């Protein structure tokens, strides 16, 4: 028997008991984990430094190292996320629909945990805490498979979590970390239907495609983020500059960063020089022929329109109207996050309804597509599929339902 199967058996067994743990005891366990992470903070940062140093020695680009890096401020943000989750309503054992039939049967739809969640993710060690905290509050056990680039960070974080659980009424067997970084272990994980109820891949296109292609366990697909911002002819140009700058520069290595900006042709002569000045010496611009007639930019190819750069690069295209902008998004977007900057109510409403994406914005940065920013305390990932869950997956997306039927002797005639 492989060690992975032993881990999964422990998780499956623990899942039966976890579903019966009270909200009070789950919240107390999360508070003890906050305390444990605080006490182990220096060790977590030291282990993270090992991962960051190894990434730099491999020549990893800065935007990806930023995803890997933990700081005191980021750990504080992680802890605040747990506090938010503690304050949220427990999503399980809630009967949202109850009705009584003519024969006297009372039927209700009750929310229940998924069971055992497997998550496969890249680089970001904060996901370890976010995913676990959401799983615990929603009554789910979790199997974590982070990337080799964050192995030291993840091992120390999971050790701190287990330390907190040992002081609580919740078993430490509800969380397991796969420490073997061999991809063949992932292949095995993807086929363990007997033990794992759902797998969530969270990372780049290659990882997500690998999981979808090889999994027999049900998956919730999180997509890459080729996100667009369309600047309409009626846009407040100062707002547009501020929004695009934030969406591109604040953290370019994340999936909700803007990768392409679409500009209405009527404002392009005025707006493009403003944009170029705002991004000067910070972002490489790649433009369509009409863009390059107005500002200096590298030539954009079809591959550029489809690229999730995760870097200080922005593709720019001039379009004739909102329909051409939407057409471009439909052709190249990844159904993640899309935005329009406009003062035209009709165009805003049209864009909101026509664009097919998990999150669609009017006059705001795409960077808000995030469980923490949405008030969920964290996220298991951002789903770009349409079944079960879509957008940032918080507590309410980590449950399923069952029908409870209560009678007093009824039989089917």
Curated annotation (Swiss-Prot):
GO-annotated molecular function: glutamate-5-semialdehyde dehydrogenase activity; NADP binding
Disulfide bonds: none
This protein's pathway: Amino-acid biosynthesis; L-proline biosynthesis; L-glutamate 5-semialdehyde from L-glutamate: step 2/2
Main location: cytoplasm
Annotated GO biological process: L-proline biosynthetic process
EC number: 1.2.1.41
UniProt entry keywords in alphabetical sequence: Amino-acid biosynthesis, Cytoplasm, NADP, Oxidoreductase, Proline biosynthesis
One Pfam family named in its UniProt record: Aldedh
Domain of life: Bacteria
Reaction equations catalysed: L-glutamate 5-semialdehyde + phosphate + NADP(+) = L-glutamyl 5-phosphate + NADPH + H(+)
InterPro entries attached to this UniProt entry: Ald_DH/histidinol_DH, Ald_DH_C, Ald_DH_N, Aldehyde_DH_dom, G-glutamylP_reductase_CS, Glu-5-SA_DH, GPR_dom
Gene Ontology cellular-component terms listed: cytoplasm
Localisation: Cytoplasm
Ranges that cross the membrane: none
Role played: Catalyzes the NADPH-dependent reduction of L-glutamate 5-phosphate into L-glutamate 5-semialdehyde and phosphate. The product spontaneously undergoes cyclization to form 1-pyrroline-5-carboxylate.
Family designation: Belongs to the gamma-glutamyl phosphate reductase family.
Protein name as catalogued: Gamma-glutamyl phosphate reductase
Source organism per UniProt: Alkaliphilus oremlandii (strain OhILAs)
Gene name, Swiss-Prot/TrEMBL: proA
């Amino acid at each position: 028997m492989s060690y992975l199967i032993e881990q999964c058996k422990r998780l499956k067994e623990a899942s039966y008991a976890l579903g019966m743990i009270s909200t009070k005891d789950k919240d107390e366990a999360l508070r003890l984990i906050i305390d444990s992470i605080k006490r182990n903070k220096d060790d977590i940062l030291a282990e993270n430094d090992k991962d960051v140093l190894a990434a730099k020695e491999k020549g990893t680009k800065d935007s990806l190292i930023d995803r890997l890096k933990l700081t005191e401020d980021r750990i504080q943000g992680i802890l605040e996320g747990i506090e938010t989750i503690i304050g949220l309503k427990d999503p399980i054992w809630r009967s949202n629909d109850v009705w009584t039939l003519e024969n006297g049967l009372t039927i209700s739809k009750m929310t229940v945990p998924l069971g055992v969640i497997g998550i496969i993710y890249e680089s970001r060690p904060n996901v370890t805490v976010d995913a676990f905290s959401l799983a615990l509050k929603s009554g789910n056990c979790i199997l974590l498979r982070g990337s080799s680039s964050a192995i030291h960070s993840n091992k120390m974080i999971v050790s701190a979590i287990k330390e907190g659980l040992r002081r609580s009424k919740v078993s430490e067997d509800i969380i397991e970390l796969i420490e073997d970084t061999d991809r063949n272990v992932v292949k095995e994980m993807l086929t363990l239907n007997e033990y794992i109820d759902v797998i969530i891949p969270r990372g780049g296109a290659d990882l997500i495609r690998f999981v979808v292609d090889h999994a027999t366990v049900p998956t919730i697909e999180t997509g890459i983020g080729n996100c667009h911002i369309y600047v309409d002819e009626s846009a407040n140009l100062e707002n547009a500059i501020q929004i695009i700058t934030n969406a591109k520069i604040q953290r370019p290595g994340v999936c909700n960063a803007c990768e392409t900006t679409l500009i209405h042709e009527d404002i392009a002569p005025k707006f493009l020089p403003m944009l170029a000045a705002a991004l000067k010496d910070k972002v490489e611009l790649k433009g369509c022929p009409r863009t390059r007639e107005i500002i200096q930019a590298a030539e954009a190819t079809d591959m550029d329109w489809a690229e999730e750069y995760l870097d200080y690069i922005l593709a720019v295209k001039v379009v004739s109207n909102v329909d051409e902008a939407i057409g471009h998004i439909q052709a190249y977007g990844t159904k993640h996050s899309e935005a329009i900057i406009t003062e035209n109510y009709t165009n805003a409403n049209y864009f909101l309804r026509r664009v097919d994406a998990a999150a669609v914005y009017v006059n705001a940065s795409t960077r808000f597509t995030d469980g923490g920013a949405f008030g969920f305390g964290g996220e298991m990932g951002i789903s770009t599929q349409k079944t079960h869950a879509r957008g940032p997956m918080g507590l309410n997306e980590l449950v399923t339902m069952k029908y409870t039927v209560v009678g007093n002797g009824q039989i089917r005639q």
